[in-house]
Regions:
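Phosphate-binding chemistry for phosphorylated carbohydrates and sugar-nucleotides
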Residues: 1-171, 178, 184
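Catalytic-core signal marking the mid-to-C-terminal active-site face
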Residues: 171-264
Length: 264
């Protein structure tokens, strides 16, 4: 992206300011890119730009920041794309593919828009597998991996940025309005260290099952709980979403403590 982004945006007629474009072989993702959008958020809050986009080291991910300085994550971007593609007749099955870690707010948005949210395990390979199997055109992850199967079978951050600019141009709406259609539900994600054997033991524990049921009852139908083993790291991931930020923090900490107690 360092070598192509400036030329790409220039060809499209965009006035672009390129930041963090001096790689030295060791500074990839260092306080920049899609994992560090804080600087972009503060810059956008000054009101000089219409949007900002941030790529990761290999530019297969893209996150955005709207004109007010609010971060727009992958779920929100997929929501924007799916809604526009449906309006244009480019959304086979009126469906978008996301993962189990996608925001509760995305699923609410999809129901309201008449879009079927197809769910897979975490990982863009599972998203693509589902898209290929069912003939769907859009899918991705909250992290900013987004696949436009009409164009290519993998995530491409620059393509995501172009598509976002296209929707803004076509609708005449600022990014804050486009992204604001998807409700943001508070989310707490905690990690618990665990090896493979411990991961399996967790799913067989009646104590954890009882604790999860208790927490789900307190949460009601305004949120959800997801406890899963990481596919890439020796971790158990505890995710709780809901409208009450204090409650979901309390429940997430209780569930994480329950995991730690069981795994000792």
């Amino acid at each position: 992206a360092v070598r192509t982004a400036e030329e790409l945006f220039s060809l499209l007629g965009a006035e672009a300011t390129i930041l963090c474009d001096a790689p030295d072989g060791t500074n990839i993702n260092r306080e920049c890119g899609s994992t560090h959008v804080e600087h972009l958020a503060s810059l956008m809050a000054e009101g000089k730009y219409d949007l900002a986009v941030a790529f990761d080291g290999d530019a297969d991910r893209c996150l955005a920041v709207d004109e007010k300085g609010h971060v727009v994550n992958g779920d929100q971007m997929i929501a924007i794309f799916a809604r526009q593609m449906k309006a244009e007749g480019r959304l086979p099955g009126d469906a978008a593919v996301v993962t189990v870690m996608s925001s509760f707010g995305f699923f609410r948005f999809a129901r309201e828009q008449g879009i079927h949210a197809e769910t897979t395990k975490v990982g863009d390979r599972y998203v693509l597998e589902n898209m290929r199997k069912n003939g769907y055109n859009i899918g991705g992850e909250q992290s900013g991996h987004i696949i436009f199967r009409e164009y290519m079978p993998t995530g491409d951050g620059e393509l995501s940025a172009i598509q976002l600019m296209r929707v803004m141009k076509k609708t005449g709406e600022p990014l804050s309005v486009l992204a604001g259609r998807m409700p943001i539900t508070p989310q707490v994600l905690l990690n618990v260290a665990a090896d493979r054997d411990m991961k399996e033991a967790l799913h067989e524990s009646p104590e954890m099952e009882a604790l999860i049921e208790e927490c789900e009852e307190r949460l009601g139908d305004t949120g959800r709980i997801l406890i899963r083993a990481s596919g890439t790291e020796p971790l158990i991931r505890v995710m709780v979403e809901g409208e009450d930020a204090a409650l979901i923090r309390e429940l997430a900490e209780r569930l994480a403590a329950g995991c730690e107690k069981l795994l000792k």
